[in-house]
């Protein structure tokens, strides 16, 4: 616990226009890596527009480590096919949380705390807003998959403070 900063809940919402890796569709799932941690979503059969709505929770010990996301096509009889990957950093999200704490309570629901634009330094496909949503600070993002012909993944990040951790 002494190295734990907090928990990051990644709500993997959906994939959009993912690559076809089987005859006419794919059976996608996502693997998320951060440091030595590895988490994965469930497989959604026969879809290039899967709705996962899976929550994956990472223990954050170093907020400077990138979070890597890889989409795979599940295959029963052979190795799973890679369908693209993306990477993001939680530094801007943590900065926004610190800023919101400095502002104190009383911010109205829906307040945009920070806006992050797509750039060559990130995998965002559109502006990403960090907002106050029902008392929680969340970041919504669409990530454009790299090393593949098409596809995006929609995520929502939520920070969870853990009593006894270093905190942010």
UniProtKB/Swiss-Prot annotation:
This is Protein C2-DOMAIN ABA-RELATED 1. Expressed in roots. Ca(2+) 1 binds at residues 21-22, 73, 75, 81. It is found in: Cell membrane; Nucleus. Keywords: Abscisic acid signaling pathway, Acetylation, Calcium, Cell membrane, GTPase activation, Lipid-binding, Membrane, Metal-binding, Nucleus. One of its GO terms (molecular function) is protein homodimerization activity. GO terms for cellular component: nucleus; plasma membrane. Disruption phenotype: When associated with disruption in CAR4, CAR5 and CAR9 genes, reduced sensitivity to abscisic acid (ABA) during seedling establishment and root growth regulation. The modification N-acetylmethionine is found at residue 1. Pfam families: C2. It comes from Arabidopsis thaliana. Belongs to the plant CAR protein family. Its cofactor is Ca(2+). Stimulates the GTPase/ATPase activities of Obg-like ATPases. Mediates the transient calcium-dependent interaction of PYR/PYL/RCAR abscisic acid (ABA) receptors with the plasma membrane and thus regulates ABA sensitivity. Binds liposomes in the absence of exogenous Ca(2+), but this activity is enhanced in the presence of Ca(2+) and generates membrane curvature.
């Amino acid at each position: 616990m002494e190295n734990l900063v907090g928990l990051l809940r990644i709500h993997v919402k959906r994939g959009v226009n993912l690559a076809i890796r089987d005859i006419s569709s794919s059976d996608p799932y996502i693997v998320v890596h951060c440091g030595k941690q590895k988490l994965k979503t469930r497989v959604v059969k026969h879809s290039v527009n899967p709705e996962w709505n899976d929550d994956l929770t990472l223990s954050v010990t170093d907020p400077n480590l990138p979070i890597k996301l890889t989409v795979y096509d599940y295959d029963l009889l052979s190795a799973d096919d890679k369908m693209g990957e993306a990477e993001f950093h939680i530094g801007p999200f943590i900065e926004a949380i610190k800023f919101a704490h400095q502002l104190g309570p009383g911010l109205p629901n829906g307040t945009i705390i920070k806006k992050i634009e797509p750039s060559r330094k990130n995998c965002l496909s559109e502006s990403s807003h960090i907002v106050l949503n029902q008392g929680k600070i969340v970041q919504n993002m669409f990530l454009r998959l790299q090393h593949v012909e098409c596809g995006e993944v929609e995520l929502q990040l939520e920070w969870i403070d853990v009593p006894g951790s270093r905190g942010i």
